[in-house]
Amino acid sequence: MCGVVSFHGLLGSPGNTHGASIKAKILALHGFDDPMVPVEHVIAFAQEMTQAKADWQLHTYGHTMHAFTNPVANNPQFGTVYQPDADRRSWLSMQNFLAELFV
C-alpha cells in the first residue's frame, strides 16, 4: 500500500503502532467542528504519525462537522452536516494526493 486517505475519520489510535514505521503516505481530511473527534485525538494522531516517521498530511476544514462529504447528512445535534465547500476542497485534495502518489 503506497497511500491512504481518510475522509472525516475518527483519528483514534489503534494502539498497535508503537515502534513501527508507517511506509504509506497519509492524508487525513477533517472537519474542525467534528464532535466525534476531540482536539486531543487530532494532536495524538499528529504525534503518532510523526513518531512512526510517516509522510502525513492533515487538512482541517473550518465550520465543518462530521460527514461533511455526505449530501444527505443534516443532523447538527448529532454532529453530522454536509458542507459543500469542504466536500469540494477535500475531493480536490484527494485528487492531488493521488496524482502525487502515481506520478
For the regions a protein language model found, what residue spans apply to each?
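Primarily recognizes the serine-hydrolase "nucleophile elbow" in alpha/beta-hydrolase
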Residues: 1-23
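Structural recognition of the beta-strand scaffold that forms the well-ordered cores
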Residues: 3-6, 27-28, 58-60
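Short, well-ordered secondary-structure micro-motifs
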Residues: 16-17, 39, 70-72
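Short, proline-enriched alpha-helix->beta-strand connector loops that line the catalytic pocket
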Residues: 21-26, 52-55
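Short beta-strand/loop motif that positions the catalytic acidic residue
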Residues: 22, 28-30, 34, 61
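Short alpha-helix in the alpha/beta-hydrolase fold that links the catalytic acid
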Residues: 38-48, 57
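C-terminal catalytic histidine-bearing segment of alpha/beta-hydrolase fold enzymes
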Residues: 50-103
